[in-house]
Amino acid sequence: PVNEVPDNLNTMRIPVSVKDSLILSIDKSPMDMIYFPEDYPKQKMLTPNLANPVARIIYSRPQINKRIIFADSSVLQNVIQRYGQDWRLGANEATEIEFFKQVTINGRKIAPGRYIMYCIPYPDKWNIVFNENLYSWGLHIDKTKDIAEIEIPVIKNDVEIEYFTMLFQSSIYGCDLVMAWGNAKTVLPIHFN
């Protein structure tokens, strides 16, 4: 026999249109995942026994949305991130990076493993920090678990980038992690050992 839902249960439901429910559930800072090599997921589907990638980053991509991205304390409203304060390099969950082999960044060896990656931005430089305090929503930093802090210069972009973006690019020594948002761009060189 087929179990039917009684009519009185159907009338107790709150009517919500599909459009409204989609709008309510859309994350304004969608999560993204990048790999090095860049096309690793496609390669893995074509070659199941392919070796692990070198690196993977999981992060959320906030948008400017008519706000000021970076500012000092003199700007009082509509600021996403203050200069000199810890930033999770995205939104929502802490940005997570995984190295599948040892790499060297600015002369510092980083062992294979998963880390959160955060930033302390300034107008002319970003300090990128790797930390072992995984699984934190937002950015609840235990600075005793910082394993490396690397200073990289800010390059001014001619084009404004609406969504915070990270991508890997091949280089002669390994790869560069390019991070861009608004008119700011940074490049973190990663050497393969």
What name fits each language-model region?
Residues 1-85, 139-193:
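Primarily secretory-pathway and cell-envelope proteins
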